[in-house]
UniProtKB/Swiss-Prot annotation:
Monomer. Interacts with REST. Residues 1-10 have a biased composition (Polar residues). Keywords: Acetylation, Hydrolase, Magnesium, Metal-binding, Nucleus, Protein phosphatase. This is Carboxy-terminal domain RNA polymerase II polypeptide A small phosphatase 1. Binds 1 Mg(2+) ion per monomer. Expression is restricted to non-neuronal tissues. It comes from Mus musculus. The lineage of its organism: Eukaryota, Metazoa, Chordata, Craniata, Vertebrata.
Length: 261
């Protein structure tokens, strides 16, 4: 495996552009993913460069092949088991990892919160991980309010040990990695209809619009985070999530016009 295929993340430059996904893999002249070094391989959700966003859909899981075709007679197999008793009445919140909760780098960082060894093709690389400000209080409270699911387009060999260290409270009831994404038109998309939950009671928190292009009405967008230790985004979002935790249908809130939209 090329070491550039383990972590899915976006750069600061991509974060400033319109609808840029994590680790854009699409070339104007080729459908093949282009190599972008170690980070792209470990950390990778990509964005569409062509056309309008896909419409939201609901119902049975949409299993999309790489060529965009929907296979016929595909048996329904959901990504999540049935909710535990303590979560049966809670909304399910899908939470992204890279640039949402943490930022990771292969370059040494003096103030890294975690250093994760990742083996790629027989070589161990050190991944330096910074925690986003307020992530601890955020995860603790979210775990109390919701059925939380970590869903990342990065590979488990990197993301799983990060989650072990990050989630001190067991907020994440499940963890989903790149193999659970739908690879569609050059993008890793998180298809919420495959979770096995009522979409009226599903939220996704992600810094990449490409990740939730199938279900934009379920999204709570969050700004990409890299290293600004004065960032308050997660802290500022908690009151909104407190409100959402009490509704019967998330669309009753998320489909309303939002300030600045």
């Amino acid at each position: 495996m090329d070491s550039s295929a383990v972590i899915t993340q976006i750069s600061k430059e991509e974060a400033r552009g319109p609808l840029r996904g994590k680790g854009d893999q699409k070339s104007a002249v080729s459908q093949k993913p282009r190599s972008r070094g170690i980070l792209h391989s470990l950390f990778c959700c990509v964005c569409r460069d062509d056309g309008e966003p896909l419409p939201a859909h609901s119902g049975a899981p949409l299993l999309v092949e790489e060529n965009g075709a929907i296979p016929k007679h595909t048996p329904v197999q959901y990504l999540l088991p049935e909710a535990k008793a303590q979560d049966s009445d809670k909304i399910c919140v899908v939470i992204d990892l890279d640039e949402t909760l943490v930022h990771s780098s292969f370059k040494p960082v003096n103030n890294a919160d975690f250093i994760i060894p990742v083996e790629i093709d027989g070589v161990v690389h050190q991944v330096y991980v910074l925690k986003r400000p307020h992530v601890d209080e955020f995860l603790q409270r979210m775990g109390e309010l919701f059925e939380c699911v970590l869903f990342t387009a990065s590979l488990a060999k990197y993301a799983d040990p990060v989650a072990d260290l990050l989630d001190k409270w067991g907020a994440f009831r499940a963890r989903l990695f790149r193999e659970s994404c739908v690879f569609h038109r050059g993008n890793y998309v998180k298809d919420l209809s495959r979770l096995g939950r009522d979409l009226r009671r599903v939220l996704i928190l992600d810094n990449s619009p490409a990740s939730y292009v199938f279900h934009p009405d379920n999204a709570v967008p969050v700004a990409s985070w890299f290293d600004n230790m004065s960032d308050t985004e997660l802290h500022d979002l908690l009151p909104f999530f407190e409100q959402l935790s009490r509704v019967d249908d998330v669309y009753s809130v998320l489909r309303q016009p939002r300030p600045g939209s």
